[in-house]
Every structure is written in C-alpha cells, then in structure tokens.
Amino acid sequence: MKRKYVFLLIAFVTMAVSCSKDKIINTHDRVGISKVTYYPILTLTGNSIIAIPNGTAYTDPGVKAEAAGADVPVTTSGTVDANTDGVYTLTYSAVNSDGYSATATRTVVVYTTAPDAAVNDLSGNYARTLNGSIATWTKIAPGVYTVFNPGGAPGTNLTVVAINPSGFNISIPEQIASDGSPTSSTNESYTNSNPATYSWKIVNPTYGTALRTFVKQ
C-alpha cells in the first residue's frame, strides 16, 4: 500500500513539474520560447513621387520609421541634383533592435518644360493596339506624368515617370521604376490627332524590343 502512495506522489510531482515547464509565455516580444521581432514600418511624409522645376532647391519632406510603436532612426541614400533634369531615387532604410531592416523609396523628378508643352494635358487611358491593355497617364506637373502599365502588358504592376518637355515630344527618362527595375524608352512619338496616338519601345530587362503603339480612349 505504501508503494502505491509513493508512486502516486511521484506521478503528481512529475505532472506538476511538467505543467510548470509547459507554461505558455505570451508577451509583446515573446511567444513561448520564440522571440517576436517587429520589423520597422516606414511612412513617407508627402508624396512618393515629387516633381520640381530645374533650379528649384529640393527639400525632402521626410519619413518616419517605427518598430513596435517606438521611433527608429532612418538612413537616407541617394541625392537630387536640382540643376540637372532627371529622375532621382531616394532610398530610406531603418533597422530594428534585432538587426532586421526595411526600406522605402521616393522618386524626385527635376524637369524643364517649354511653354508649348506646359499647356498640354496628355492624361487619360490609352489602349495598346496589339491587345487592348490600358496604359494610364496622370499629369503631376507641367510636362511630367506618371504612366501605369507603360508597356501595355496584361497583369503588370509597373509605374514609370514620363516627360513631355516640348511640343508633343515624349519619353521615359532613365529611372528606377516602381518595381525596382531600370527602365527607359526609345523610338518615341506622339500624334495629337483625334484620337491621339503614341508609340515607344520600353527598355527594361523583362520587356522585349517591340514598338508598342497606343490609342487614346
């Protein structure tokens, strides 16, 4: 009988210790034996694409980074030459206390637009003649546009900056596009007819060399 009581006591103690070891920890930085890390979240102040006339000083609106509700220092790479036309990319990065990083980018366009192009508004939807896929132009400054789906490729999520510096001349200046790829254009033409049409070749690692023609809708 004594042996039975001893056995039951040992079993009870073992079970109690086991339950103690299996206690679940659930705090803001730990779940069980796993450590929780909070990646930095970067929030841009102002627009992700900013256009300024050539010769205008550029002042960055800034960016805020947080991890688990606490501010995290931000490092900025890239520069803007406000006296040279072009499309510039600024990259912001932040690292949390565990060494994990996150980034965000801003595009800055420095432009010079002639009076005969400044009055143009090329905004609108243009259908590619090959497949009907839509490229959407949005004017953000005189002679400066964002173009979603510039290649007229179904299923794409690419946005670029296009310029109309004079008359009806158009182009995609060399830039890092929204998907991080180097992108530009060649063989561009725009005809201000009714409906308007334009053509260009997209220079991008994932695009071919075909001339792409679009008609305004």
In which residue ranges do the predicted regions lie?
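Bacterial Sec-dependent N-terminal signal peptides
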Residues: 2-43
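Solvent-exposed, low-complexity, repeat-rich "mucin-like" stalks and linkers
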Residues: 21-23, 33-68, 131-134, 152
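Short, exposed coil/turn segments at beta-strand boundaries within extracellular/luminal domains
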Residues: 24, 97-105, 206-208
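Edge beta-strands of extracellular beta-sandwich domains
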Residues: 27-30, 103-108, 211-215
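Serine/threonine-rich, repeat-prone extracellular segments and beta-strand-based repeat modules
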Residues: 69-101, 111
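C-terminal edge beta-strand
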Residues: 100-118
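Ser/Thr/Gly/Pro-rich, low-complexity flexible regions
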Residues: 114-217
